[in-house]
Amino acid sequence: MALNDETKVVVLLLPFPVQGHLNPFLQLSHLIAAQNIAVHYVGTVTHIRQAKLRYHNATSNIHFHAFEVPPYVSPPPNPEDDFPSHLIPSFEASAHLREPVGKLLQSLSSQAKRVVLINDSLMASVAQDAANFSNVERYCFQVFSALNTAGDFWEQMGKPPLADFHFPDIPSLQGCISAQFTDFLTAQNEFRKFNNGDIYNTSRVIEGPYVELLERFNGGKEVWALGPFTPLAVEKKDSIGFSHPCMEWLDKQEPSSVIYVSFGTTTALRDEQIQELATGLEQSKQKFIWVLRDADKGDIFDGSEAKRYELPEGFEERVEGMGLVVRDWAPQMEILSHSSTGGFMSHCGWNSCLESLTRGVPMATWAMHSDQPRNAVLVTDVLKVGLIVKDWEQRKSLVSASVIENAVRRLMETKEGDEIRKRAVKLKDEIHRSMDEGGVSRMEMASFIAHISR
């Protein structure tokens, strides 16, 4: 984009190359661009294409910069891995964005009063050359929950007693990620000291105490809780009038009668776990939509065929009318927004948690890796808007069909489930009010926009 002398502020966003990071960065881009601020979004050719493909809103007011990186292997997901290590080659390839990002910063900084670089916390090393430009301010976007990040800081400090604060019992980070990724995180943390402040996709309504704790931990730097970024209203049909078949199926179901089952874009389940899950859903006798697709590869466009999971013989025929199996990309926000959806069995990725919380849908938690076990604690123990399917302490074990059946029934047809659902709806209403005119989230976003536009 050609800039002119009147240009005051330009914002450059630099996401980490996985779906759970690409999308919230696009959502934030959309919100900033709506304030008549020039927004640039940077990534590899592959991941810019992926981000656009899976984003719901128009992106015409966002300037994309797709840079080539050296070829990298894109192995299939390995369901035996506790962590999605198959994605690490794409992470390493993205390190080559440092040079083109530096050149783009040089170009933008020469034409604007101020360049605001918002980099993913996992792209801190790529963003390091921002320090070379006097009119570039750098902010770190944490796409994780405030509880998760505060837990990281607290753990690094040796878990000292905190005045007037009690942490829930959360898993150690070491058990949630691989040793290789731990080294990667350590390398990124070396560059966090150059930040002007931190941004979180959360709300003080959802995580107020943990946002305040982060402010205590942040050495005087600003902390903004700008979320949730997920849109509160979504259309059943896309821009050309297409409606996913599962939405038509939902239209025929009773209110709050369907449990939605999806484990995100980085989880690959073992074949025997798929069999148990299918049996558990069938035996629960509850209506369900089950998204059954393999985890993303580092390059989702490499042309290789994704694994097709085998279900028990005759399963889809037996559950016809009761359940729907979706083997492609599903419109998750639309499903969660539908009045027939009454529960969400989830891996507890933070984006999925926020989408569920903003729609008042209670969760059945089944954490897999990374921040997910801590998010599950937030949902079940802190907010009390969900129940546990798989306990993190039993993460190496197969979850039996009977355990799955029991969890689904508890959420969907018991008094306990009804109480959880009432709390979820109450929290949804509080979140929505916070995003209305005068609400705490709306005011925090206005504060951030005023700060970078000053």
UniProtKB/Swiss-Prot annotation:
EC nos: 2.4.2.40
GO biological process, one term: protein glycosylation
InterPro entries: UDP_glucos_trans, UDP_glycos_trans_CS
Chain segments annotated as transmembrane: none
Keyword Transferase among UniProt keywords: yes
Residue ranges that the Swiss-Prot or TrEMBL entry lists as coiled coil: none
Known tissue expression: High level in young seeds, less in older seeds and very low in roots.
Cited Gene3D superfamilies: Glycogen Phosphorylase B
Keywords, alphabetical: Glycosyltransferase, Transferase
Catalytic activity as recorded in UniProt: zeatin + UDP-alpha-D-xylose = O-beta-D-xylosylzeatin + UDP + H(+)
Single GO term (MF): zeatin O-beta-D-xylosyltransferase activity
Family according to the record: Belongs to the UDP-glycosyltransferase family.
Function summary: Utilizes UDP-xylose as the sugar donor and catalyzes the formation of o-xylosylzeatin from zeatin. Does not act on UDP-glucose.
Protein name per its UniProtKB record: Zeatin O-xylosyltransferase
Protein's gene: ZOX1
